[in-house]
């Protein structure tokens, strides 16, 4: 959520910066509401002062034995007007708050300006895509050969965009997640967490999924109780652990990691990636979250991205890093890097991780603060998140990049300790 001071003092500048994201801010509506809010607030303050004066006069008149009925009537009338003013003021503020919750974050000055993914800027590449001397099979065909990927069984259970994994491929999927968690906790300094997969609306509002992106979520309605939502990412549960907290400066940075399933309706993805595991309603992901001092968040973004890259490097999977343009960044991001892994069957790089600095955008929504030792006062923290990595898409990349001519899959060296001696999946 943006700082309300920005919207009051620099509204047109904010609108211009948001326009670079393709977001049209209704400046006239906000100005109109602000004018009404100020007018009602001024009138209410004046009325309160008059009421206080009348109340004082009642005591004086009573002491003199004068008729206080007219004064009492005035005070009662003013009390009713004050109550009506409060209702009006609350309504205006609720409308302003509703608008603010739909406004995306302001992009950092270092973010390339652009309208779509076509304007993203490649920052670097790592590794060279393998030259195959046989016809490349995609992960669906490879899974059929080994019997380890079954989309028909999943469709029977749940419909489209689900998968059943079995045997060595299921184990490889588990191995990938364990490897990622061990790397991030053992070498990158993250603390592992196990968090709920069901959260309530305030948590999703805190990280920015609600109210704007409810159609992307799976919702569980409960009669007489608060609704649940299945998490679209562990970013929601991990980041909200600091909601409403004031963190001691000595505790920062907080570095949290979790391996969870993620659930997404893919409401806007009709017809896209319908084959295989690239785009699923349910998929596993290892998520990294950092909570840092504001002055250190851009440096932390570079480190977070490097942590995600290290997974791909150790798996020896070719990838590239993109700086997302203003028009392609996520709702809450100040700046984002995407990691894209090489998928041989598609002859292109596909997103496997998104690493974002959200600045104080989420912290303001959650009221997550730290105590600045220089001032002694609570201030908003900065939050960051990144996939480290999406497990299903990493499995796709491993299957395709490590395939052999007969359809078997070599197990990457770093995963062999997790595979119980299995070196080739047939």
UniProtKB/Swiss-Prot annotation:
GO terms for biological process: selenocysteine biosynthetic process; seryl-tRNA aminoacylation. Gene3D superfamilies: Bira Bifunctional Protein, Domain 2 (3.30.930.10), Serine-tRNA synthetase, tRNA binding domain (1.10.287.40). It catalyses: tRNA(Ser) + L-serine + ATP = L-seryl-tRNA(Ser) + AMP + diphosphate + H(+); tRNA(Sec) + L-serine + ATP = L-seryl-tRNA(Sec) + AMP + diphosphate + H(+). Pathway: Aminoacyl-tRNA biosynthesis; selenocysteinyl-tRNA(Sec) biosynthesis; L-seryl-tRNA(Sec) from L-serine and tRNA(Sec): step 1/1. It comes from the Bacteria. SUPFAM superfamilies: Class II aaRS and biotin synthetases (SSF55681), tRNA-binding arm (SSF46589). It is an enzyme of class 6 (ligase). It is found in: Cytoplasm. Consists of two distinct domains, a catalytic core and a N-terminal extension that is involved in tRNA binding. Belongs to the class-II aminoacyl-tRNA synthetase family. Type-1 seryl-tRNA synthetase subfamily. This is Serine--tRNA ligase. It comes from Pseudomonas putida (strain W619).
